[in-house]
Amino acid sequence: MTVGKQHINKSLLYEGRVVSNSMNKTVVIVVETRKTHPKFKKIVRRSIKIKVHDEKNECTIGDKILAIETRPLSREKRHRLYRIVEKAK
């Protein structure tokens, strides 16, 4: 992916659903991953919560967004909003 002249590494992008937007300029997203258990071969779902910087306060609960890793913005924020993939209905 390219943004202007910059190349963006896909390993730095996280796709997730917004679960909270109660903080100013910050949203919390849940990123789910699926892995196969090495011994039992069952697909296991793991999820993590990430705090994302939303400069314009444009995300609402239920939106699907892409977040990109960036420098630390606060104690817990290490990601910023890249783009909104799908708006909530």
Curated annotation (Swiss-Prot):
GO terms for biological process: translation. Signal peptide: none annotated. One of its GO terms (cellular component) is cytosolic small ribosomal subunit. Part of the 30S ribosomal subunit. One of the primary rRNA binding proteins, it binds specifically to the 5'-end of 16S ribosomal RNA. Belongs to the universal ribosomal protein uS17 family. This is Small ribosomal subunit protein uS17.
